[in-house]
Amino acid sequence: MSKKAKAIKKTNAMRLLDQVGANYTTHDYESTGAISGVEVAAALGQDPSMTFKTLVAEGAGRQSKGGGAERTKEHYVFVVPVAAELDLKKAAAAVGEKSIAMIRQKELLPLTGYEHGGCSPLGMKKQFRTIIDSSAADKETIMFSGGKIGLQIETAPAELAKALEFEYGEIV
């Protein structure tokens, strides 16, 4: 299944891909502390447009049938290119919310099981509705966090779909 140069301790994300027989490659890099996704892509010699970051947001209000907004507190996962910023209005529209807000960094680990800088869309404590930026749809492969700082997973979007239910959306 996976192709790797040296033995890497399996993360939940890797286990999920293995369970469904998805093909993927792992890439590891030396962690230098707080490192941006663009820096990770550069460290691995990858194009930043094929390298994606995982962001978690909370719904702040959904349109009710009567026209008002109701508070939802639903959590959503958005996967966007590392060189791009999530457009909160587009992201809210993609999930049917009036608005969304990014969760606080201190909420990430208890909510997802992943730390900041190592958050993967795969293998979270609970599966949240996931929207991947539509720019990923035409890529041969995409790369995203493998579930810990210093580890990236590269796979085809079709392979990712074997392990993760997601939708594409215009979110940047």
What are these regions (language model features)?
Residues M1-V172:
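Extended, low-hydrophobicity, polar/charged segments
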